[in-house]
Amino acid sequence: MENKLSFEEAISQLEHLVSKLEQGDVPLEEAISYFKEGMELSKLCDEKLKDVQEQMAVILGEDGELKPFTALGDEA
């Protein structure tokens, strides 16, 4: 799975695969292929969400409050 997909692109592709599978007229081998691709997309989305969650934790700090921005060298 190409990691260059944005979260939105990956979700869109995942929704498309789910829609195809929900129709129920997909041959078994193709359904398995869609399922595998969907699992990869799901994993990619999960990784991207975890990355954002980590970034938000850094921005907000442990107490959930916004930290004041300090530029490099302004810590004096």
Swiss-Prot record:
The keyword DNA repair does not apply. Keywords: Cytoplasm, Exonuclease, Hydrolase, Nuclease. The keyword Electron transport does not apply. InterPro entries: Exonuc_VII_S, Exonuc_VII_ssu_sf. Its main location: cytoplasm. GO terms for cellular component: cytosol; exodeoxyribonuclease VII complex. It catalyses: Exonucleolytic cleavage in either 5'- to 3'- or 3'- to 5'-direction to yield nucleoside 5'-phosphates. One of its GO terms (molecular function) is exodeoxyribonuclease VII activity. NCBIfam families: PRK14063.1, xseB. Bidirectionally degrades single-stranded DNA into large acid-insoluble oligonucleotides, which are then degraded further into small acid-soluble oligonucleotides. HAMAP family: Exonuc_7_S. Heterooligomer composed of large and small subunits. This is Exodeoxyribonuclease 7 small subunit. It comes from Bacillus mycoides (strain KBAB4) (Bacillus weihenstephanensis).
